[in-house]
């Protein structure tokens, strides 16, 4: 599942270090720790989730086709596991409520499927990530930060995951609510 990640990117494992309870030994080898975290993600992202990702791609392709986008556009925008984890990570940081997660996923996908009218995702959590955290509310100036994670001035998904999402956020990213919400 790491095939879409460029080696050497400083945040390349963000999103794949599954939040869970782990047992480690004092002075455990860092490579062993990473292997355990990544293996757990791989176990949690089951074959069923891979099938759900294909179903999601089919649904998104149908929406893009209905909006007049051609096959090359659709193929270039197929969701990978990396993309899915990126969406799930935004959901994870946008809400603490599992009940709202699938609606937030719907807003993200609705915007991704209508880039002519909604070129930017405008996800506040990506700005907070790009800034390294904030005290207080976001400002207009915050949304203008030059960062590949800024979804206020860059189209499509941010450069990568902004957190390590849990199962409920991954599930929401795979099973979005059926809404017409863009906000």
Kindly give the residue locations of the regions a language model identified:
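Bacterial extracytoplasmic/cell-wall-associated proteins, especially those involved in peptidoglycan
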Residues: 2-183
């Amino acid at each position: 599942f790491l095939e879409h990640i460029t080696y050497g990117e400083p945040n390349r494992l963000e999103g794949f270090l599954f939040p869970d309870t782990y047992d480690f030994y004092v002075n455990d080898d860092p490579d062993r720790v990473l292997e355990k975290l990544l293996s757990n993600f791989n176990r949690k992202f089951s074959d069923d989730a891979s099938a759900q990702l294909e179903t999601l791609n089919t649904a998104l392709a149908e929406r893009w086709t209905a909006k007049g986008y051609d096959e090359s556009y659709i193929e270039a925008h197929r969701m990978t596991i990396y993309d899915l984890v990126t969406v799930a990570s935004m959901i994870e940081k946008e809400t603490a409520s599992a009940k709202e997660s699938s609606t937030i996923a719907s807003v993200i996908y609705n915007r991704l499927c209508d880039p002519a009218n909604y070129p930017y995702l405008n996800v506040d959590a990506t700005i907070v990530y790009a800034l390294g955290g904030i005290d207080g509310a976001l400002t207009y100036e915050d949304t203008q930060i030059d960062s590949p994670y800024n979804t206020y001035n860059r189209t499509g998904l941010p450069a990568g995951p902004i957190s390590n999402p849990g199962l409920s956020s991954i599930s929401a990213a795979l099973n979005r609510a059926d809404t017409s919400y863009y906000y």
